[in-house]
């Protein structure tokens, strides 16, 4: 049984599909839902870390995803801002450290030979995760 669901978003249509699915799953199962944004950081060795998104952009991404989750029946969605050098590693590490038992990720609608391949973040999360991973598309 699922108790805690983590769903990353980057504001794309593909991640919105994952958010909607995760919200519906949480509503049906009674699981707690957390929506996260992974703010990928670059640099750092001798200089400051440079983040992909500003704090305001992270807040806007989370606000939009939480609103979407609410439209799909998920109450009391937790907001999580993860800073990591790599998106998949940040998602998996946060999920492990905080007791999540299900991760829902989005991936693009691919055609032809590329349909055999998942998006790199989704594939990396599936390969590294300690828990169930659902890929929504």
Where do the protein language model's features map onto the residues?
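Conserved acidic residues
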Residues: 3, 101, 130
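Small/aliphatic-rich secondary-structure junction motif
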Residues: 3-52, 70-72, 76-77
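Short secondary-structure boundary segments
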Residues: 37-39, 102, 106-108, 137
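A short acidic, glycine-rich active-site loop
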Residues: 50-61
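Structural beta-alpha unit
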Residues: 70-103
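Glycine-rich, Arg-bearing micro-motifs that act as flexible, cationic patches
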Residues: 102-127
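Short, acidic/small-residue loops that bind anionic groups at enzyme active sites
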Residues: 128-137
